[in-house]
Structure formats: structure tokens, C-alpha cells
Amino acid sequence: MGSSKLLVAFTLIVMMTISYDLFTGIGIDARTVPPTCYESCNATFQNPECNKMCVGLAYKDGSCIYPPPEVDGLPPKRPYFPRCCCNPIILSPPSP
């Protein structure tokens, strides 16, 4: 019985620690995601919706593409889908 109480207490402490925002108390209100596609961008590609789609994609001819051009030297199985150029993205913290 004592070990089950200890397990429940430990689980609650872990859950509270994970859900508690540690950075709020020190004034960090946003995080910056570095761009993955940024060379030769033009104004038509620079908007928040494009930036959201572009993170993590490959870059080619002024835009992001999916899938990446080659994986381990093999050509892609699917056609390229051009995406938008990226600027650094400022993400606001999740709302409570």
C-alpha cells in the first residue's frame, strides 16, 4: 500500500513538473525558430503562412520543396511541391 501511494505521488509530481511553464517566471514569452529556407527569397514568399509550411523542407531555386531532391542519392518517388521562402519565425507562447 505504501509503495502505491509513493508511485501516485511521484506520478503527480512528474505531471505537474511537465505541465508547469518554467520560463514564464523569468520573462521568456516567445521562442524563435531558425529558418531553413532563406536564400534568394522575395516579398511574395515572405508571409507567416508560408513560413509555417516551409520549416524543415529542402530549398531549391528560391523556394522550399517537398520532398527533398535526393535522399541517399536516390531521386524522389513523388513530384516536387514548391513551397515558400522562410524568415525567422517568432512563435508566441501557448495560451493558458
From Swiss-Prot:
Subcellular location: Secreted
One Pfam short name: Defensin
Record key words, sorted: Antimicrobial, Disulfide bond, Fungicide, Plant defense, Secreted, Signal
Disulphides: C37-C86, C41-C64, C50-C84, C54-C85
Signal peptide: 1-19
One annotated GO biological process: killing of cells of another organism
InterPro entries, alphabetized: Defensin-like_dom
Gene Ontology CC terms: extracellular region
This protein's record includes keyword DNA-binding: no
Main location: secreted
Homology family: Belongs to the DEFL family.
Protein name per its UniProtKB record: Defensin-like protein 69
Taxonomic source organism: Arabidopsis thaliana (Mouse-ear cress)
